C-alpha cells in the first residue's frame, strides 16, 4: 500500500523497547513515522490531562532509526497525542498507533490504560487508531507484535476502517509458532481482590500500595455476535485478541431496564 504518515505514542515512555520495535516495524514497511510519547513511564494514567503545569517537549530522534522524528513530552499519553495533533505535526496523520505496551490491556482495565487513552485521542480526532500490547510484563520480544500491528492496521485501512472505532490489540506472550489464531473479541469485566497493601512508615503512619490480583473475568454483555470470545480467554489460549472499542459509552439497552425517572424531583407538587 502507499506510504502512511503514522503517529506513534505509548505510556511506557520514550526509552521503552516496545515503542522502538513498533516504530521500526512501521518504518520497514515504508511508512513515515513520528513518535511523540512521555519522557518517562506513565503507565495507568488513564485519560488524564495536564492542566496545572505547562507541557515541555524535547527532541529524541537519536533513540530511533534514522528518519524517524521523535519527541519526549512531560505530559501524559493523552497529552502527547493531543499535542502532536494540534502543534507538533505538520499534517494530520493517516494512523495513530499506541504501544507496544509492556503488559496486557484487557477488559475493563482499558479505562486505566495510558496506552489505550493515547489511541483514543486519535479516535476522537477521527484518525484510525490502534492500541497494541504484549500480554506480559516480562516478555521482551516485540518484533512479531510490531509486524502484526502493521499488518492489521494496513488491512483495516484498505477495508475502510471507521475512524470512530478504536482497535485494541493484545498479543499473547509466546513464540510465533505457538500462536494459534487472530479473532475479534469482547472486553471482559475484570474483578480484583486485595487491591491495596497497607504498610506502616518509620513514624507509625499508615500508607498504601495499590496491588491486587485478578480473581474473576466475566464476559461483557455487548451486542457483538454471541460466539465472540472474551479478550482474556483469547490470550489464555495463546490466541491474538482484537477488540473494537467505541468512545461512545452510551447505554444501548431498553428504557425498561433503567431506573425510573421521577419528575416530582424537578417539579414537586
From Swiss-Prot:
A GO-annotated cellular component: cytoplasm
InterPro entries: SurE, SurE-like_Pase/nucleotidase, SurE-like_sf
UniProt KW keywords: Cytoplasm, Hydrolase, Metal-binding, Nucleotide-binding
Domain of life from the UniProt record: Bacteria
Pfam families to which the protein is assigned, alphabetical: SurE (PF01975)
Major localization listed first in the record, in broad terms: cytoplasm
Classification via Gene3D superfamilies: Survival protein SurE-like phosphatase/nucleotidase
Localization (cell): Cytoplasm
Leading EC class: hydrolase
The enzyme's E.C. designation: 3.1.3.5
Cofactor note: Binds 1 divalent metal cation per subunit.
Chain's role: Nucleotidase that shows phosphatase activity on nucleoside 5'-monophosphates.
Protein name: 5'-nucleotidase SurE
Organism, as annotated: Prochlorococcus marinus (strain MIT 9312)
Underlying gene: surE
Amino acid at each position: 500500500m502507499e506510504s502512511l504518515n503514522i503517529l506513534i505514542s505509548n505510556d511506557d515512555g520514550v526509552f521503552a523497547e516496545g515503542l522502538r520495535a513498533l516504530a521500526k516495524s512501521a518504518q520497514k514497511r515504508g511508512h513515515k513515522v513520528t513518535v511523540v510519547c512521555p519522557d518517562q513511564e506513565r503507565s495507568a494514567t488513564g485519560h488524564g490531562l495536564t492542566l496545572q503545569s505547562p507541557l515541555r517537549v524535547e527532541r529524541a530522534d537519536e533513540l530511533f532509526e534514522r528518519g524517524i522524528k521523535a519527541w519526549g513530552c512531560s505530559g501524559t499519553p493523552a497529552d502527547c497525542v493531543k499535542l502532536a495533533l494540534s502543534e507538533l505535526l505538520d499534517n494530520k496523520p493517516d494512523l495513530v498507533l499506541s504501544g507496544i505496551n509492556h503488559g496486557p490491556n484487557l477488559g475493563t482495565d482499558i479505562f486505566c490504560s495510558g496506552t489505550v487513552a493515547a489511541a483514543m485521542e486519535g479516535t476522537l480526532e477521527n484518525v484510525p487508531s490502534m492500541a497494541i500490547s504484549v500480554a506480559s510484563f516480562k516478555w521482551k520480544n516485540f518484533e512479531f507484535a510490531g509486524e502484526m500491528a502493521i499488518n492489521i492496521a494496513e488491512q483495516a485501512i484498505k477495508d475502510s476502517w471507521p475512524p470512530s472505532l478504536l482497535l485494541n490489540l493484545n498479543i499473547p506472550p509466546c513464540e510465533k509458532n505457538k500462536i494459534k489464531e487472530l479473532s475479534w473479541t469482547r472486553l471482559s469485566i475484570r474483578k480484583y481482590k486485595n487491591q491495596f497493601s497497607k504498610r506502616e512508615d518509620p513514624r507509625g503512619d499508615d500508607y498504601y500500595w495499590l496491588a491486587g490480583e485478578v480473581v474473576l473475568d466475566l464476559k461483557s454483555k455487548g451486542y457483538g455476535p454471541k460466539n465472540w470470545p472474551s479478550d482474556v480467554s483469547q490470550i489464555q489460549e495463546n490466541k491474538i485478541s482484537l477488540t473494537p472499542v467505541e468512545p461512545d459509552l452510551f447505554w444501548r439497552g431498553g428504557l425498561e431496564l433503567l431506573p425510573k425517572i421521577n419528575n416530582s424531583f424537578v417539579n414537586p407538587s
